[in-house]
From Swiss-Prot:
Highest taxon, organism lineage: Eukaryota
Residues that, per the record, bind Zn(2+): 62, 70, 79, 82
Cofactor details (free text): Binds 1 copper ion per subunit.
Protein's name in the database: Superoxide dismutase [Cu-Zn]
Enzyme class: oxidoreductase
Enzyme Commission number: 1.15.1.1
Catalytic activity: 2 superoxide + 2 H(+) = H2O2 + O2
Length: 151
């Protein structure tokens, strides 16, 4: 079993912790709690770089080693880092999801990359414009953190 953790922080009140775990070559379970969000859906992605020296903007674009367009987690064509949306109620998004494209090892490893929660709902690449195919029109980056291995 491989485990990883990400502590999310931003310039505002948004913060949280996300845990990742993977058994052998199986899917990755992603479980987290993010506080300080407005109610509703917020895009949640893995970005290419583990760099937050200039805030979350330093994390770069979505993790996309196969040069595909943005999509929903269940789509055949998507960025590896496209994990869809988390939904906040009373300011808190508590979620558990499973993804078969990200990994904690190998070519699709997310270790050392940033997880980012966005200000708006991810349109899952179905917004009908160029930005939708890049970012899902998810808007600004509210909080981010580097994903690291843990016990």
């Amino acid at each position: 079993m491989v485990r990883a953790v990400c502590v999310l922080a931003g310039s505002g009140d948004v913060k949280g912790v996300v845990h990742f775990q993977q058994q052998d070559e199986g899917p990755v379970t992603v479980e987290g709690k993010i506080y300080g969000l407005t109610d509703g859906k917020h895009g949640f992605h893995i970005h290419e770089f583990g760099d937050n020296t200039n805030g979350c903007i330093s994390a770069g674009p979505h993790f996309n080693p196969e040069s595909k367009t943005h999509g929903a987690p269940e789509d055949a064509v998507r960025h590896v880092g496209d994990l869809g949306n988390v939904t906040a109620k009373d300011g808190v998004a508590e979620f558990k999801l499973t993804d078969s494209l990200i990994s904690l090892k190998g070519n699709h490893s997310i270790i050392g990359r940033c997880a980012v929660v966005h200000e708006k709902e991810d349109d899952l690449g179905k917004g009908g414009n160029d930005e939708s195919l890049k970012t899902g029109n998810a808007g600004g980056r509210l909080a981010c953190g580097v994903i690291g291995l843990c016990q």
